[in-house]
Regions:
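Short acidic/glycine-rich loops and adjacent helix/strand connectors
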Residues: 1-181
Length: 181
């Protein structure tokens, strides 16, 4: 996962039944190098100044550099796992957000999940933000669901605040209700 803060990639290996059971096996953060950070920042600035989104040669070059960085670090992450952990069923891929405006029904992430899946030879699930926006969300669906799963054993009210390029919160009321923004 990578967001608008342009700091790096967060990887998590999670074992889950897809509902309530969630076990975090490993987390790792890979900091962007200056070149990647500057390229993504330049791309965001161009789109902000132009007030429109377009894909051109520069966009595709930056996207390829970003995907190369992702693939390199997936390889490193996988190489550090034990043999029993290396069987990965799927990768949830959230590319770097370069445009995000849920009120205008738009969120664009850098990184083509089809190219990633073909390169790493593991199925990739993506496009979380846009699917959430189409369902009247704010475009940040993964973290609240994760929070609900990891705090499912407590009956206390919990608020988790994510302060990044786009801040959001998860408010868990006991074991039953989830409010997110």
């Amino acid at each position: 996962m990578s967001g608008t803060s342009i700091d790096g990639l967060d990887f998590s290996l999670i074992k889950t039944d897809g509902m309530k059971n969630v076990k975090i096996i490993k987390n790792k953060y890979y900091k962007f190098n200056k070149k990647i950070r500057d390229e993504i920042s330049d791309l965001i600035n161009i789109f902000c100044l132009e007030k429109k989104f377009f894909r051109n040669e520069k966009y595709y070059k930056i996207e390829q550099n970003f995907l190369n960085f992702v693939v390199k670090n997936i390889s490193i992450f996988l190489s550090e796992l034990s043999d029993g952990e290396k069987k990965i069923d799927l990768v949830g891929f959230h590319g770097n957000t370069i445009i995000h405006n849920p009120k205008k029904n738009i969120s664009i992430q850098l990184g083509d999940p089809k190219i990633l899946a073909k390169t790493i030879n593991i199925p990739v699930v993506a496009n979380f933000r846009n699917r959430d926006i189409k369902n009247l969300g704010e475009g940040a669906p993964l973290v609240p669901i994760f929070h609900k799963a990891i705090f499912s054993k407590t009956a206390k009210n919990i608020i988790v605040i994510n302060i990044g390029g786009i801040s959001n919160f998860t408010f868990l009321i006991g074991k039953t209700e989830l409010i997110a923004s």
